[in-house]
Amino acid sequence: AARGLQVNDLSPPVQPSGHASVPLFRDYLAVVRKAGRHRFEWMLRRCDNGLDVPAEVTVSAIELDAEPAMLATIRDLTERKVYEEKIHKLAFYDALTDLPNRRLFFDRLSQALAHSERSGQYGAVIYLDLDNFKPLNDQYGHLAGDLLLQEVGRRLAHCIREQDTVARLGGDEFVVLLVHVADNLESATDLARQVAERILHDLARPYVMSLDEQGNAARKIEHLCSASLGMTLFPPCESDSETILRRADRAMYQAKGEGRNKICLAEVD
């Protein structure tokens, strides 16, 4: 079915690596001519339906009728890629909310610290804990709690920019990472506080959940669940992720101790 077709007929214009397909394939063929064989991953585009298919391609230099030729064998990697994506998601994302987990949060915080050191800009971490979560679980069970946590994740995601991160650390604890906020402490503090206030406002709105119990008609419940927020800025010279998170955590507990449903700012050392 592919007889007479060129690589640009069988590939998207750009590979997942970001390289243009045609010149990249030429580079691979040059390797084959030199080494005799080359194996690589390639995104193919099906001729019949235009869908892209991940594949492993092995190209070997051969002789055909006493003339040099190349033989390509192709293995479909779709199932393997789906499996790898599942493993990646289990490793880096919270199963309940689909938010980044603690491990991915620390990866992104480390990247943010490196960027902050290069750019001279401040970042911020907002640590939050829900104020009235346990009574919901006690009264209505874990299904209601799970539904509320999922909604908390959605509300938090709407409060931040695309380049920022919301992660679930576990239980009813979440953390927000704001990157390259501003190049001076005063402006960065003001901007980060605006985000924290938006979070405080959005999480304080009533939660309405539908519980479907044992096949019966769904029962709607309404619950109020504010949050206590601890916020800290990290300057360009800081490099300890654990210290930053502990500082935000202490500020969060200070907010709890001062009556809940508020923001406390940890001073930058």
Model-derived segments and spans:
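Short loop/turn elements at sensory-signaling interfaces that couple input to output
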Residues: 57-70, 236-240
